[in-house]
Amino acid sequence: MIDITLPLTDIHRHLDGNIRAQTILDLGRQFNIALPAQTLETLIPHVQVTSTEPDLVSFLTKLDWGVKVLASLDACRRVAFENIEDAARNGLHYVELRFSPGYMAMAHQLPIAGVVEAVIDGVRDGCNTFGVEARLIGIMSRTFGEAACLQELDALLAHRENITALDLAGDELGFPGSLFLSHFNRARDAGWHITVHAGEAAGPESIWQAIRELGAERIGHGVKAVEDRALMDFLVQQRIGIESCLTSNIQTSTIASLADHPLKTFLEHGVLASLNTDDPAVQGVDIIHEYHVAAPAAGLSREQIRQAQINGLEIAFLSDGEKRALREKVAAA
């Protein structure tokens, strides 16, 4: 189902949600951190979703073991590098990796700005080694409150030239976007793009707020947009993209089944919706699974899957020239 003549992208992919189980074992042993299991096979149920979680917050706890072993900046650098290696193995030409530096720093009180620098270094080394093109999106973890998000923002702004966009993720119901207006004002002043997790746990009003108050150019997940036709019309008119993550939305119980997922409706309506993974290691999936298994199960035709692939590059945070160069590079391969 993947069109090999077109660039393959993943623009909603959490770096800190893609820490390999083997790396968790390795770092746990290196830093003498007690883990819930000592073999890869027995660790998997603790760090990977093996059945549907009751809600988004429960799903997010599966990420915790990955960051609990980040006891040094070198460990952060390693997982960033491995994220690019994984992207290359998946056949991705372009990836946007988003990460929450405060979340990654929390367990071992690492300097947040140091985490940002380590991630930048690891991604740069990975791109040079594996030939994947990547951009970084900084996340503010809303779950930890406004002050913690301000610390994350300050650390990200210290390396603003290496960060492409700002995102807001976490407990959407408990921490609405209205709490973070000044944070996003600073991000826009820095020249960053804006994407926001919205319409995943909360309703269409959360998406409207992300667009009107935070300046979102893209929406992460955005499944509840299907409940508001005027909103879908607005997304089309303003070319605001939806970063769809099919398997993730089932595992978080955001959507009951793939057959119920609104991605097909979005594409039929002309919304610039794309296919993405979200947290590949935690979910036990890759981008190939999303195209070959999840998308057909969600009712997408071959042409709709191809359109979602086209949309992935269309709404990527790249200049028109960079998009054209990537298309030409893939076409010539």
From Swiss-Prot:
Function: Catalyzes the hydrolytic deamination of adenosine and 2-deoxyadenosine.
Binding-site residues for Zn(2+), renumbered to this chain: 12, 14, 197, 278
Name the UniProt record assigns to this protein: Adenosine deaminase
Alphabetized PROSITE patterns for the sequence: A_DEAMINASE (PS00485)
Residues given in the record as substrate binding sites: 14, 16, 170, 279
PANTHER family per the UniProt record, alphabetical: ADENOSINE DEAMINASE (PTHR11409:SF43)
EC number, as in UniProt: 3.5.4.4
Cofactor(s) required for function per UniProt: Zn(2+)
Keyword tags: Hydrolase, Metal-binding, Nucleotide metabolism, Zinc
Gene that this polypeptide is encoded by: add
Cofactor note: Binds 1 zinc ion per subunit.
GO cellular component: cytosol
Enzyme class: hydrolase
One protein family per Pfam: A_deaminase
CDD domains reported in the protein's UniProt record: ADA (cd01320)
InterPro entries: A/AMP_deam_AS, A_deaminase, A_deaminase_dom, Ado/ade_deaminase, Metal_Hydrolase
Catalytic activity from the UniProt record: adenosine + H2O + H(+) = inosine + NH4(+); 2'-deoxyadenosine + H2O + H(+) = 2'-deoxyinosine + NH4(+)
Membrane-traversing stretches: none
A GO biological-process term: adenosine catabolic process
Organism: Salmonella gallinarum (strain 287/91 / NCTC 13346)
Single GO molecular function: 2'-deoxyadenosine deaminase activity
Active site: 200
Annotated site (Important for catalytic activity): 221
UniProt family annotation: Belongs to the metallo-dependent hydrolases superfamily. Adenosine and AMP deaminases family. Adenosine deaminase subfamily.
